Amino acid sequence: SSARYNETIWDGGGNDTIRIDGNAASLIDLTPGSWSQLGLPLTYSERDLNTLAVTQARPDLTDARTVFIYDTVLIENGIGGGGNDQLIGNYAANRLSGGGGSDRLFGGAGDDTMDGGAGIDTVAYLNTRASYILTSNVGGLSISGIDGTDTFSGVERLQFADRKIALDLSPSEHAGQTLEFLGVVAPAAINNPAIVGAVLNLFDQGSSTRDVCQLAINIGLVGQIAGSTNSIDIARMAFLNVVGVPASTEMADLLVSFMDGRNA
């Protein structure tokens, strides 16, 4: 990622791959006739014609586009590095691997294979959710539509033209933690995309469940739902939402003891 490139890729055939190393966010665009953003941006300056000494930097001319794929060349595969990369496929059957970081993958036309790798990775599609069929397979998922049939693994989110879908629904994953949190403090909010998205974003940023709960209390969300900011009222609300019956005085006091640290 610290290298400097200013080049055009030409290839006569075979199965080819562009791979980026390092942790800087990069763009790999496999579309023929397109630019990728790899390595350090190109920088320019003015120099004295006699001494060649730099007389003025030209940051206004800085260009992140560094690697060009010739318009008749087909590169099949892209592998990202440790940053939050964007990988764009072409009309071939591409293999796109995000690597580390929270990556965004777009296969385009063709039957593509995509692996998000580490991080919170997203596979994007141009059309609406109704245009595709999502199928669970051994070891991953596949999605079929006008673009072809793609298979993917290590992907946490799908983005369509009209909506986003979270796939990381286990209790240890962010979308699962979001549903658990809202199920306790505000079950009705699970049907509100804006609230779900806001809470999910907090978990994606690394917040713990305790952090999210405290923030919900601080901004008044829990108090608004419970009708009170009193710990005992909040504990009773949470118990009712989870168990379905009111908490006894003893149970409510036990829950409060966890909240205030007496029984942490």
What is each of the regions a protein language model found here?
Residues 120-147, 159, 225-230:
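Acidic glycine/aspartate-rich repeat arrays in secreted/surface proteins
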Residues 83-87, 95, 100-109, 113, ...:
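Solvent-exposed, low-complexity segments and loops of surface/extracellular structural proteins
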Residues 8, 17, 27, 74-77, ...:
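Discrete beta-strand positions within long extracellular beta-solenoid architectures
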Residues 26-31, 135, 148-156, 166-170:
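Short amphipathic beta-strand/extended segments with alternating polar/hydrophobic composition
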Residues 13-15, 22-24, 32, 79-84, ...:
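Extracellular, beta-strand-rich repeat scaffolds characterized by small/acidic residue-biased motifs
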Residues 157-264:
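Composition-driven recognition of low-complexity segments enriched
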Residues 1, 27-77:
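Acidic/polar low-complexity surface segments
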